[in-house]
Amino acid sequence: MGSRAAGSVLLRHLCPRVSSSTSAAAHAHAQRPPLAGAGGGGVALWARLLSTSAAAAKEETAASKENTGSTAAAKAEATKAAKEGPASATASPVASSYWGIEASKLASKDGVEWKWSCFRPWETYSPDTTIDLKKHHEPKVLLDKVAYWTVKALRVPTDIFFQRRYGCRAMMLETVAAVPGMVGGMLLHLRSLRRFEHSGGWIRALLEEAENERMHLMTFMEVAKPRWYERALVLAVQGVFFNAYFLGYLLSPKLAHRVVGYLEEEAIHSYTEYLKDIEAGKIENVPAPPIAIDYWRLPAGATLKDVVVVVRADEAHHRDVNHFASDVHFQGMDLKDIPAPLDYH
């Protein structure tokens, strides 16, 4: 009985509040304006939406026209600059790039602006042309004999193909001779990284050798203009020789360096024959290319004969370095144990 009395009292208090809430909701519904599609209020609201969309469309059209105009102006300026060509570029050179890298302005010893980007004034030198050209490593052990006769076998097809066209022969020789230094330097570099040890300067020495041989090629490209089939031959020979020397150096560095030593001996012989034909008048002694004059610090009136003399001296130095490197390995030592002959020209 007590719970029933309490329930009846609670109902008497709640009923008036529920009825008042319901009437308030009905009154609010009656006062709310109709939505779209429900009379004049909907039409007005739809008109406002249409006017807003139209304004936005006009703004987008104006912005699009403005962007199109600016793009057209930029294209016109670029076309004008392209038509003006080098003169415009010379008049307003780019001082620095986005990355802050500025083109260095160098000059030679006589104050003339340096025109070569492939080498710098401090990388030029005067080779020692008094070096002994007749040095020869006599093959005694098996590996030496393998290296010696491998090089001799490679000379046979070269003699047949080029005969006495020593300009093209030198070009082909330098495309091959520039490979060993790069391969050896690369493998020593990777070994230094793996073992956390220095190379004794041999990485730099071998890479300098590769760069020097490449400069020989750049020089003889100015002297002998290769034909299309000679360029194709260079592609084939370089591809085969690079992979063969790479595998050979992995298997036996002492054999690889000995092969290069004998290869340089053959290069000395080829350049000696080249000089004989120049002196005999069989090959015209043309003026030396400008790149050769600056690279080897030759006199202004230098000729092709002077170029061949300094290139032959370079090959003799490379012969000594590679035979020396092979001797180091034959004595059971690593190249890092013996200081490299840096700047040995």
UniProtKB/Swiss-Prot annotation:
**What membrane topology term does the record carry?**
Multi-pass membrane protein
Which EC class does it fall in?
oxidoreductase
Chain segments carrying region Disordered: 60-91
Write down the required cofactor(s). Answer: Fe cation
Which keywords does UniProt give here?
A: Disulfide bond, Electron transport, Iron, Membrane, Metal-binding, Mitochondrion, Mitochondrion inner membrane, Oxidoreductase, Respiratory chain, Transit peptide, Transmembrane, Transmembrane helix, Transport
Q: Which GO terms describe its cellular component?
A: mitochondrial inner membrane; mitochondrion
State which tissues express it.
Answer: Expressed in leaves and panicles.
Cross-referenced Pfam families, in alphabetical order?
AOX
Any idea which positions bind Fe cation 2?
A: E213, E264, E315, H318
Q: What are its E.C. numbers?
A: 1.10.3.11
Question: Where would you find this protein in the cell?
Answer: Mitochondrion inner membrane
Catalysed reaction equations from the record = 2 a ubiquinol + O2 = 2 a ubiquinone + 2 H2O
The note on cofactor binding and number reads:
Binds 2 iron ions per subunit.
- Kindly list the residue ranges recorded as spanning the membrane: 170-190, 232-252
Question: Where is the transit peptide, renumbered to this chain?
Answer: 1-50
**GO BP annotations, alphabetical order:** alternative respiration
GO molecular function ontology, one term from the record:
superoxide-generating NADPH oxidase activity
Free-text function comment from the UniProt entry: Catalyzes the cyanide-resistant oxidation of ubiquinol and the reduction of molecular oxygen to water, but does not translocate protons and consequently is not linked to oxidative phosphorylation. May increase respiration when the cytochrome respiratory pathway is restricted, or in response to low temperatures.
User: What name does the UniProt record give this protein?
Assistant: Ubiquinol oxidase 1c, mitochondrial
Q: Species name for this entry?
A: Oryza sativa subsp. japonica
Q: Name the gene that codes for it.
A: AOX1C
